[in-house]
């Protein structure tokens, strides 16, 4: 697939994308504001400079894990990892620490927030998230079909959203707790063509031969278009 070089929004505003050595180097928004990006020798994002000249810097360990974000004012967000490269903590600019714990399969099972409260998660034998619960016991639950497609989502209040799929695993229909239906159609290679929400409003997508999104026509009739190199 090609790289996005231009995106035209529904109002005709154009955003341009420029690349150096295959990496995104500059984004120019419809007002002419530029955001520039640099990379380290491993291709990791090293810095981002916004239109006002504010620089955010990124540092990594030898495995490519992000260790810190340093903002223009000198404040930082830092991250730690275990021997398997799983993130174990995040410290925000105010020193608040969020901690993460995993099961033997690498699934995130516990998040300890800065105030000490804990969120827990459970998984199926196939590693799919079965439930997530906060410190008060409010739980959201998920079920899946034999192909791993998510069938239901039940929120803490008992409201259930149902999903239906075709044989290829493409999402065809979502039915919310109020009976509202969102429907999806696809082309012969599985690219989404239309999305129709519960009010009957439809978005329509078109693609080039490489499968790149070319246009998205909104329910209002306005269109978003994309060009590639």
Regions found by a protein language model. Name each.
Residues 3-9, 13-29, 33-50, 54-71, ...:
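Beta-strand elements of repeat-based all-beta scaffolds
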């Amino acid at each position: 697939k090609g790289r996005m070089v231009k995106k035209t929004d529904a109002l005709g505003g154009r955003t341009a994308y420029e690349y150096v050595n295959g990496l995104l180097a500059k984004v120019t928004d419809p007002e002419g504001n530029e955001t520039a990006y640099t990379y380290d020798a491993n291709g990791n994002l090293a810095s981002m400079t916004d239109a006002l000249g504010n620089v955010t810097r990124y540092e990594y360990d030898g495995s490519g894990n992000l260790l810190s974000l340093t903002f223009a004012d000198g404040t930082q967000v830092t991250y730690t990892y275990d021997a398997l490269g799983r993130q174990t903590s995040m410290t925000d600019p105010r020193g608040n620490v969020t901690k993460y714990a995993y099961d033997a399969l690498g699934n995130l099972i516990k998040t300890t927030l800065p105030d000490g409260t804990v969120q827990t998660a459970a998984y199926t034998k196939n590693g799919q998230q079965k439930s997530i619960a906060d410190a008060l016991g409010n739980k959201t639950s998920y079920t899946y079909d034999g192909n791993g497609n998510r069938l239901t989502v039940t929120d803490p209040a008992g409201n259930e959203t149902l999903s239906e799929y075709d044989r290829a695993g493409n999402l065809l229909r979502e039915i919310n707790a109020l009976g509202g239906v969102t429907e999806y159609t696809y082309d012969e290679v599985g690219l989404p063509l239309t999305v129709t929400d519960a009010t009957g409003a439809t978005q329509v997508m078109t693609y080039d031969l490489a499968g790149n999104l070319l246009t998205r026509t909104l329910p209002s009739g306005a269109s978003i278009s994309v060009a590639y190199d």
